[in-house]
Amino acid sequence: MYTPANNHNRSLAMSTQPTPAAARHCKVAIIGTGFSGLGMAIRLRQEGEDDFLIFEKDAGVGGTWRVNNYPGCACDVQSHVYSFSFEANPEWTRMFARQPEIRAYLEKCWEKYRLQEKTLLNTEIGKLAWDERQSLWHLHDAQGNHYTANAVVSGMGGLSTPAYPRLDGLENFQGKVFHSQQWDHDYDLKGKRVAVIGTGASAIQFVPEIQPLVAALDLYQRTPPWILPKPDRAISETERRRFRRFPLVQKLWRGGLYSLLEGRVLGFTFAPQVMKLVQRLAIRHIHKQIKDPELRRKVTPDYTIGCKRILMSHNYYPALAAANSTVITEGIRAVTANGIVDGNGREREVDAIIFGTGFTANDPIPRGVVFGRDGRDLLDSWSKGPEAYKGTTTAGFPNLFFLMGPNTGLGHNSMVYMIESQIAYVLDALKLMKRRELLSLEVKAPVQERYNEYLQRKLDRSVWSVGGCKSWYLHPVSGRNCTLWPGFTWRFRALTRQFDASAYHLTTTPLAALSNEARQQAEGVPA
């Protein structure tokens, strides 16, 4: 795999550059231990590269499937496609795996490939800065430790930082407050009056779990989601035995599920009229599970299905229809010491407030964390929303790769497929760096710009843009869709199958050591 240039005839080769004595060096630094980070580490090891470190801010691995452990937490993509292609699991017990089983799967992968020795737990990278003189990334953790790396792979994704709405008076509330991603399992909800704020993917899973326990459940809904029945079921021991004995059967099953899911993209991007048929199914689901006309009205969206993420549940609507549940659509005026005042001025007393308000997906990395060439903050480059070339690299940030980066999200299939596509692209880039003794590679700004213009043209015609809703897919400042891939996943895989060196500035000498004219040429700026 990737080895820094070490030719004795070239005094500027990276391996001859001194690094601070306190810094621990690796060729590849991987941030995060979800599907992205672990997948990258496993593939590096399979390719024979062992000089890498994995940084994980939490006390264990699993990423979002470790920290999101609220009641009812589960995947909304079938288990056999929501897993690594190179690490099939014949032991899935349900069609849609629940959080403990997915976390256990990732932990098993971590252990099988002996990644414990490469993982630094409880190590949050607080600053990441590019050093032009040495062509290295400097990483600093919260404890003050210093690391350097030739390349950095970010596997943090966009679902790592909880989003909280701004509510007047929240600081005065005397009861319990927490976000679904930071569930307080020590707090007993039994017999409590609970307010749930938000109706996203997390809320529709935990609301049915807590509704039978609480004395009263007030659900504050700004925009209702479209919800389809969830075709979940247990996978029998007979089926699991068949998958164990005949791996090809499981492979064919996985392929069939993938193809079935892949076809759904037609309604999102190519033929939005198809969504009318899906919308009828969703309306039928509402009428089947809710008898009260007023509640039906409250939970029926006024936008085209697919504009916001389509959710799946078989027990959310019955939970809302229960006698102890109230759906409040008037908004929130303020939070008081003992409750919440709605938009009509009515105060409802509660013992606890639970946020089901999602994540900061459009600004996944805060300001002051990542600094590229010339000390540029990543958020300055992303002022109109996250932007990358093939969702993986960003101009001005050499040797930095994003997995689950901008415009790689899906509304129809498994993200693991996209992650594996990106991993293959990054591996090919690292191989090129070794083969050609490169110190750095950086996507050309015009190439990145043209690629994203192409994406936005496709997205402008999609249901996500014309469906009549305001969703977290769209950046709050620019209105651009910085989240989703507007097409078939196999098309993205074709684009990332091979690293396209012509789209990049490739350097064998640190830019800081070049003459001004040579530096401008390397950066693609006319002299």
UniProtKB/Swiss-Prot annotation:
Ligand binding (FAD): S36, E56, T64, W65, R66, V67, D76, Y82, I125, M415
**Superkingdom of origin:** Bacteria
Taxonomic lineage of the native organism:
Bacteria, Pseudomonadati, Pseudomonadota, Gammaproteobacteria, Pseudomonadales
Signal sequence span is: none
Positions of the site: Transition state stabilizer?
R309
Per its record, what are the GO molecular function terms?
flavin adenine dinucleotide binding; N,N-dimethylaniline monooxygenase activity; NADP binding; oxidoreductase activity, acting on paired donors, with incorporation or reduction of molecular oxygen, NAD(P)H as one donor, and incorporation of one atom of oxygen
Name the Enzyme Commission number(s) assigned to this protein: 1.14.13.-
SUPFAM superfamilies per record = FAD/NAD(P)-binding domain (SSF51905)
Family named by the database record: Belongs to the FAD-binding monooxygenase family.
Which keywords annotate this record?
FAD, Flavoprotein, Monooxygenase, NADP, Oxidoreductase
| Organism the protein comes from | Pseudomonas aeruginosa (strain ATCC 15692 / DSM 22644 / CIP 104116 / JCM 14847 / LMG 12228 / 1C / PRS 101 / PAO1)
Answer yes or no on keyword Flavoprotein. yes
Q: What's the stated role of this polypeptide?
A: Catalyzes a Baeyer-Villiger oxidation reaction, i.e. the insertion of an oxygen atom into a carbon-carbon bond adjacent to a carbonyl, which converts ketones to esters or lactones using NADPH and/or NADH as an electron donor. Thus, can convert bicyclo[3.2.0]hept-2-en-6-one into the oxidative lactone products 2-oxabicyclo[3.3.0]oct-6-en-3-one and 3-oxabicyclo[3.3.0]oct-6-en-2-one. Is also able to catalyze the sulfoxidation of methyl phenyl sulfide (thioanisole).
Q: Which residues bind NADP(+)?
A: A74, C75, D76, T199, G200, A201, S202, A203, I204, Q205, R222, T223, K308, R309
What protein does this entry describe? Baeyer-Villiger monooxygenase
- Report the PANTHER family cross-referenced here: FAD_NAD(P)-BINDING DOMAIN-CONTAINING PROTEIN-RELATED, L-ORNITHINE N(5)-MONOOXYGENASE-RELATED
Names of the cofactor(s): FAD
